[in-house]
């Protein structure tokens, strides 16, 4: 079975995918308002609420998340109080073996099921800048996500998007006009022994990807508008978002 996705669809004014939005503890991009208004359900992971609070000064009534979850070591007291007073659900998830992002996905999936929402994707803002250990924690959550939700989970920050391709065949539509000029395939978890692609300037044919051998960075598109990837192990897709 081939898995088809248009990764940048949520950023399009005419985008058709239904999605939920997760805000992580990093500065919010200019696409934040667009993503917020189109989302079916909105959540903040701990300190993500600080950034939401700060960037919406003067219009906070229009930007109330359905819930804020986390161990609450990052959210400022006045921010937590503000959203609690406004009726946002405050959910403590103290487990230190998982990140606030991972735990937020768990809560979000339960909400989707409780509300019987028809959702195509989970869009995450933040998690790809600043501290390298936290960037890798975001990637680790993508590896855990299939045990939490059947929905594709993408992470967006500034000019980058990442999405973890599971073993199998994938079709990525890259003809929205929002794509930047670079893309890549990163074998983060373990080497991929058999990777075959079409639609890239530098395609792979039954090739191995692995750190210390070959990593497909700074690739680009062949102009066809569609990239196909077949992989035998999880493989991280990354792509540029046009400013």
UniProtKB/Swiss-Prot annotation:
UniProt keyword annotations, A-Z? ATP-binding, Kinase, Nucleotide-binding, Transferase
Annotated Gene Ontology MF terms?
ATP binding; kinase activity; thiamine binding; thiamine diphosphokinase activity; UTP thiamine diphosphokinase activity
| Gene Ontology biological-process annotations | thiamine diphosphate biosynthetic process; thiamine metabolic process
Among CDD domains, the record links this protein to: TPK
Pathway(s) it belongs to: Cofactor biosynthesis; thiamine diphosphate biosynthesis; thiamine diphosphate from thiamine: step 1/1
Q: Which SMART domains match?
A: TPK_B1_binding
Gene3D superfamilies assigned: Thiamin pyrophosphokinase, catalytic domain, Thiamin pyrophosphokinase, thiamin-binding domain
InterPro entries for the chain: Thi_PPkinase, Thiamin_pyrophosphokinase_euk, Thiamin_PyroPKinase_B1-bd, TPK_B1-bd_sf, TPK_catalytic, TPK_catalytic_sf
List the EC numbers from the record: 2.7.6.-
Name the catalysed reactions.
Answer: thiamine + UTP = thiamine diphosphate + UMP + H(+)
**Under which main EC class is this enzyme filed?**
transferase
Under NCBIfam families, the record lists: thi_PPkinase (TIGR01378)
What's this protein's family per the entry? Answer: Belongs to the thiamine pyrophosphokinase family.
Subunit organization = Homodimer.
The free-text function statement in the UniProt record for this protein reads: Catalyzes the phosphorylation of thiamine to thiamine pyrophosphate (TPP) utilizing UTP and therefore links the biosynthesis of TPP to pyrimidines metabolism. By producing thiamine pyrophosphate, a cofactor of the mitochondrial pyruvate dehydrogenase indirectly regulates pyruvate oxidation and lipogenesis. Although it can also catalyze thiamine phosphorylation using ATP and CTP in vitro, it does so with significantly lower efficiency and without physiological relevance evidence.
The protein here is known as: Thiamine pyrophosphokinase 1
Q: From which lineage does this chain's organism come?
A: Eukaryota, Metazoa, Chordata, Craniata, Vertebrata
């Amino acid at each position: 079975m081939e898995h088809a996705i248009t990764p940048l669809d949520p950023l399009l004014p005419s985008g058709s995918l239904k999605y939920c939005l997760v805000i992580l503890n990093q500065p919010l991009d200019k696409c934040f308002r667009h993503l917020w208004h189109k989302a079916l359900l909105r959540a903040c992971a701990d300190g993500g609420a600080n950034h939401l609070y700060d960037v919406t000064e003067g219009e906070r009534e229009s930007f109330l998340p359905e819930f804020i979850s986390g161990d609450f070591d990052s959210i400022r007291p006045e921010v937590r109080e503000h959203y609690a007073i406004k009726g946002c659900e405050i959910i403590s998830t103290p487990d230190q073996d998982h990140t606030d992002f991972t735990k937020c996905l768990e809560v979000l999936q339960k909400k989707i099921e409780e509300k019987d929402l028809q959702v195509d994707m989970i869009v995450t803002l933040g998690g790809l800048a600043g501290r390298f250990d936290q960037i890798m924690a975001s990637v680790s959550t993508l590896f855990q996500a299939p045990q939490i939700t059947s929905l594709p989970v993408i992470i967006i920050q500034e000019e980058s998007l990442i999405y973890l391709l599971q073993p199998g065949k994938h079709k990525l539509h890259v003809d929205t006009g929002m794509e930047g000029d670079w893309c890549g395939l990163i074998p983060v978890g373990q080497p991929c022994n058999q990777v075959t692609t079409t639609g890239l300037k530098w395609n792979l044919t039954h090739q191995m990807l692995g750190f210390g051998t070959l990593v497909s960075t700074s690739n680009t598109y062949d102009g066809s508008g569609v990239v196909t990837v077949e992989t035998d192990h999880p493989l991280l897709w990354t792509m540029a978002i046009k400013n």
